[in-house]
Amino acid sequence: MPSAPSAAAPDTVLVVDFGAQYAQLIARRVREARVYSEIVPSTMPVAEMLAKNPAAIILSGGPSSVYAEGAPRLDREIFEAGVPVFGMCYGFQLMATTLGGTVDNTGAREYGRTPLHVSKSGSTLFEGTPDEQPVWMSHGDACSAAPEGFTVTASTDVVPVAAFENDEKRLYGVQYHPEVMHSTHGQQVLEHFLYRGAGLTPSWTTGNVIDEQVELIREQVGTRRAICGLSGGVDSAVAAALVQKAIGSQLTCVYVDHGLMRQGETEQVEKDFVAATGVQLKVVDAEERFLTALKGVSDPEEKRKIIGREFIRVFEQAQAEIIADEGPEVAFLVQGTLYPDVVESGGGTGTANIKSHHNVGGLPEDLEFELIEPLRKLFKDEVRMVGQELGLPDEIVQRQPFPGPGLGIRIVGEVTKERLDLLREADAIAREELTAAGLDREIWQCPVVLLADVRSVGVQGDGRTYGHPIVLRPVSSEDAMTADWSRLPYDTLAKISTRITNEVADVNRVVLDVTSKPPGTIEWE
């Protein structure tokens, strides 16, 4: 079969990542404006960036000072190529110093919510926004003079140049972070850059994503076959549905029952997903294999990598069986990898490896499959929209996120069958009560964690007990890059706690995790 032509690339905004905490959020905000965005490292040569033919470029914030030795730099060429550029925070200061402006280390630091005074209300970025507006600052250096040819459009009480514009060269910058919700009119300012400054039209949709991926998948797979691991979660389900739309019966889904799933998960996969898609499904019972491999292991990184390794080995076995049954080569493995997975596994410049995800950093080096990752550049909310567009039912699309390694990384300590059964019971109670209270759509997810290596004293009945604590970790988020703990009603928390301590053996304490992300990740391991 001849190869299909490469999918036409949409107008693309490049987000240059200087190691900013919010670099991924910038990309997401651009996409919310229905313009496609991609992230590139600041170490990429400018010529290589321009070779991507970007419709616009955004320079992210970053932790460095523009005067620090070894601080990220950019070739001046990026500002002279005729491509619209928007600098934020560090990107703003880098634009200023590169083009002849002045940035000083004045000691006048601004962190958090700050009043911005707009002096040019009719400017490209600020038209239609208030003259006084709260913005989110995070900087130590300050711009005291704009480059020649730039108009200063805003200031703060301590920073004389908090925003500037050069409409002729289509160069714009702000000292603050317009991408965070604390900058009340930040999205409007960003859209003004995209639509007015860069002249882009809001045309990127989930339909575009589906069409592009279908074409790319068909080109990649050709006449060969693919298998996809279904985990019971949203990501793998949407990835499988998207690949099936592209190659139909050339896809076989494999559900690995590794014994680390929640209560009723296997039955739900067989019932909901197969009924919705009609996909070919092979179920593999691998509980004993996984528990044997995890025996005696408490280190979370080691657990993740063992689960990733065994997952692939089971797939290789399933591959051989599918070939024996159906003939053509199974050369591809479909994975529901998302943008945050890649970032947290060290995929962004200037960012640390927070944890290895089983479908990113946890794969063995001798992997025998070529990967298909149709969701790799999408955030969770975008994945849900793609799922809805593909016709998947709400029972699948609106499910709360659940990690591929399953309950194996919600047990702090060694994973055993007894501990899994205990955690399954507690998790089922929490999910049941959250659903009964109508809170499923109010929270992003609620991991239930067993502190298996910890015991606490309790009193149950007339006797002293020495049982395990269970941790509830309800969080609210838009994309899993940042999260806040959810303020659940006390009555709901009380019901969950009472039921768990009454109904689950060896648990005598339920605690609530009230940590945001950062500093804590959503999952405990």
Swiss-Prot record:
Pathway per the UniProt entry: Purine metabolism; GMP biosynthesis; GMP from XMP (L-Gln route): step 1/1
Protein name (Swiss-Prot/TrEMBL): GMP synthase [glutamine-hydrolyzing]
The UniProt record lists the keyword Transferase: no
Enzyme class: ligase
Keyword Nucleotide-binding among record annotations: yes
SUPFAM superfamilies: Adenine nucleotide alpha hydrolases-like (SSF52402), Class I glutamine amidotransferase-like (SSF52317), GMP synthetase C-terminal dimerisation domain (SSF54810)
Keywords in alphabetical order: ATP-binding, Glutamine amidotransferase, GMP biosynthesis, Ligase, Nucleotide-binding, Purine biosynthesis
Gene Ontology CC annotations of this record: cytosol
Residues annotated as domain Glutamine amidotransferase type-1: 12-203
Any GO molecular function: ATP binding
Functional description taken from the UniProt entry: Catalyzes the synthesis of GMP from XMP.
